[in-house]
Amino acid sequence: ISCSLVGSEMCIRDRIELATKVMLGLPVEKPNKSLFDFDYVGIKASQFSFNRLQKADPVLGVDMASTGEVGCLGDDSGTALLTAMLSVGHRIPKKNILLSTGGAKQKADMLEAARTLKEHGYTLYATGGTSRYLTENGVANHLVYWPSEEGTPQALTMLHNREIDMVVNIPKDLTVSELSNGYKIRRAAVDLNIPLITNSRLASAFIQAFCHIDMDDLPIKSWSEYK
């Protein structure tokens, strides 16, 4: 949570104004709550414009790549995250999800989310290493092939045929084949306006949120209702 989110959007009383008065030695009324003592959660979701940056690899590094942010409040972290993700253009997938979950740690991080998707009726498509890992851990899935591999179904073809509703693609390493295959999948998702997530923690949290929160039950509240 950024300072601006805590200082303004999350607080009925502006903490930035309060801090400024303290620094200037002006009299202030002592807050009746700790800075982080809230009965609700605030989450900011970044918005990216990779669809306008032709051929750019839509994967995040240390550089600032977002072109905007949306800060949302919720009664819990799942509600706040789901509201924020929807606000920056993500959609709830209807049926088919493509998984390529990176290295061993990221695969382990995504395992419970993959199980949750299956429990909620989603069909999982996975590239080689991810497919093997899911199968070994009892999660049914369909193997798809990288652009550089022979065989069908091809992940890229499924994307172009609009057979995939969301892509989770976690970059694994810097090998030529990994970068080339991953780039083609990520770039196709962006160009075809298919929701793409490239971070395992965010993907897991988003999946748990939309699987356990019914959209009809997602509360719509004004900022003034959070006190």
What are these model-predicted stretches?
Residues 1-12:
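Single conserved hydrophobic/aromatic residue that forms the stacking wall/gate
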Residues 18-94, 98-99, 103:
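Peripheral (often C-terminal) accessory segments that flank ATP-dependent C-N-forming ligase machineries
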Residues 77-83, 101-105, 123-126, 145-156:
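A general structural motif
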Residues 85-97, 116-119, 158-164:
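Glycine-rich phosphate/diphosphate-binding loops that line cofactor/substrate pockets in enzymes
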Residues 98, 121-133:
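Short internal beta-strands
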Residues 146-147, 152-227:
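Peripheral docking tails and interdomain loops at the edges
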